[in-house]
């Protein structure tokens, strides 16, 4: 059907156009997508066997949907992508505020216009991009905002009484007729406002200010909410929850590989940054592991969750930290070093909610310790786990069997390595080669690694040994200091720092 050629109701009737509800429309288009083996929600990763099938079943059942999950779980994005399941264009009565179907008008305006002009009633065509409404639920949202109210100014201008239906000012829901309407953070909506949605969900109609009118609206409702309202702002009233046919539980990425894909897809990295800064797979995994460590930490509020935005923001900050260093040192290109990861601390502190014990430790210390735990966890994936070496009895494990003996002995001899944040790449590499046994260890386990990869892995070994308490590590102003444990008894384990050790300027 060429919608551009159809301008009147008569032409629409002759074309054989058949009205259908938005839920039927989405159902039919979804069936076509499934038959064509197309993903109706492209770009949504990690939900292929859970949330997406649940959503497809709900849409095939013509249900309203509640996405229930912690922050940063793509709930709103799922709703927005439903726009692509709508027909490209639908006809409406020209000038209608609520997108009246020309064949099934419901507003006084459309009914009167069709009664007056008949088949000559003008038709407009509405693109699917205009058939999506979204409202963030806040405590100040009123019934008038959502449903509508009497407009005294309109009544005065048109010289109509308040008993006349034409004095109504429609809210955002009636204006979303024949559209998808999303209410984000549903628990934030006051209980009395939630009650006003009962009729729309159950009967498909609404009443405004006691008017005896019935508007059988055609709307697909999608709601988003947290499973527990961790801010104590409110909750979803039970009768409303009962009227939402499908409740779908979202979740965080279950594997590191999925999380890596999401971060790379969502991170906003410019072409100039991509050319100047190279990021190894090791750095990417360390950043992702921080989120997994945070979700399992006793110091982080599990009711709040740890958003995927944490790793996206951290990834961007890590690249920017390396870029800034390269600009300062006038280097044409560089790579992200582990020392650059100190720059992701602000991304962590701003994305986690701490429990009481975490607040006592302080956000910077908790964030730093999460990074340390990430290094500790990933270290065992690349090199022999020092913990297993510690557990061996001395008679079973000769000193030469410890692959880290030469490195720790170098530090035991009183040597110190100062890894400055703004050191040039070549100077950092020369510094790392001074540590006995460090290059040999990396070469043994990564024979085909490039020179840059070797240098990064050498730095990783130092951080990994510090995370396992084989050497000490202390973050100081402008640098990270590595030395032997006996010489740093006050900083055993490298993860125990006072809040005073962190200066706001160190993270900028």
Task: Give the label of every model feature segment.
Residues 2-257, 268-285, 298-302, 383-508:
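Conserved ASCE/P-loop NTPase catalytic core
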Residues 34, 150, 294, 322-325, ...:
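Generic structural signal for hydrophobic core residues of well-folded globular domains
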Residues 59, 82-86, 90, 201, ...:
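Amphipathic alpha-helical interface segments used for dimerization/assembly
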Residues 263, 287-291:
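Short alpha-helical scaffolding segments that buttress acidic/His motifs in well-ordered protein cores
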Residues 273-280, 293-370, 382:
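C-terminal helical "lid" subdomain and adjoining coupling/linker elements of P-loop NTPases
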Residues 358-372, 376, 380-383, 390-391, ...:
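Elongated, mostly alpha-helical coiled-coil "stalk/stator" tethers of large membrane protein machines
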């Amino acid at each position: 059907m060429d919608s551009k050629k159809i301008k009147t109701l008569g032409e629409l009737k002759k074309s054989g156009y058949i009205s259908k509800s938005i839920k039927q429309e989405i159902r039919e288009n979804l069936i076509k997508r499934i038959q064509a083996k197309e993903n109706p929600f492209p770009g949504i990763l990690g939900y292929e066997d859970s949330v997406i099938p649940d959503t497809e079943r709900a849409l095939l059942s013509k249900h309203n949907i509640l996405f229930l999950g912690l922050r940063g779980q793509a709930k709103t994005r799922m709703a927005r992508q439903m726009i692509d399941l709508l027909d490209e264009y639908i006809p409406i009565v020209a000038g209608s505020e609520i997108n009246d179907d020309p064949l099934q008008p419901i507003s006084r305006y459309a009914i009167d216009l069709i009664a007056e002009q008949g088949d000559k009633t003008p038709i407009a065509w509405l693109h699917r991009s205009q058939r999506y409404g979204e409202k963030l639920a806040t405590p100040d949202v009123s019934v008038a905002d959502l449903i509508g109210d009497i407009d005294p100014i309109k009544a005065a201008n048109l010289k109509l009484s308040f008993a006349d239906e034409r004095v109504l000012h429609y809210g955002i829901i009636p204006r979303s007729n024949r559209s998808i309407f999303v209410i984000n953070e549903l628990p934030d909506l006051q209980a009395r406002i939630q009650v006003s949605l009962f009729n729309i969900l159950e009967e498909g109609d609404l009443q405004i200010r006691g008017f005896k009118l019935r508007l059988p609206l055609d709307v697909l409702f999608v709601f988003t909410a947290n499973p527990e309202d961790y801010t104590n702002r409110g909750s979803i009233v039970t009768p409303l929850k009962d009227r939402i046919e499908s409740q779908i539980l979202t979740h965080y990425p279950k594997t590191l590989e999925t999380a890596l894909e999401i971060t790379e897809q969502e991170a906003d990295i410019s072409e100039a940054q991509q050319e100047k800064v190279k990021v190894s797979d090791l750095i990417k995994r360390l950043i992702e592991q921080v989120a997994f460590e945070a979700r399992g930490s006793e110091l982080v509020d599990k009711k709040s969750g740890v958003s995927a935005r944490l790793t996206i923001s951290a990834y961007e900050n890590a690249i920017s930290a390396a870029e800034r260093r390269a600009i300062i040192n006038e280097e044409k290109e560089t790579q992200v070093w582990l020392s650059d990861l100190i720059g992701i601390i602000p991304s962590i502190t701003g994305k986690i909610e701490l429990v009481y014990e975490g607040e006592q430790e302080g956000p910077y210390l908790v964030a730093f310790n999460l990074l340390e735990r990430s290094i500790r966890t990933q270290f065992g994936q690349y090199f022999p786990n020092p913990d297993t070496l510690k557990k061996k009895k001395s008679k079973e494990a000769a000193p030469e069997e410890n692959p880290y003996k030469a490195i720790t002995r170098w530090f035991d001899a009183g040597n110190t390595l100062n890894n400055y944040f703004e050191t040039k790449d070549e100077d950092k590499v020369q510094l790392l080669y001074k540590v006995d046994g460090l290059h040999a260890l990396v070469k043994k386990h990564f024979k085909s690694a490039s020179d840059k990869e070797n240098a990064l892995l050498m730095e990783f070994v130092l951080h990994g040994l510090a995370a396992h308490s084989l050497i000490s590590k202390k973050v100081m102003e402008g640098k990270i200091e590595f030395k032997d444990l006996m010489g740093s008894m006050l900083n055993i384990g490298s993860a125990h720092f006072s809040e005073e050790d962190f200066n706001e300027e160190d993270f900028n």
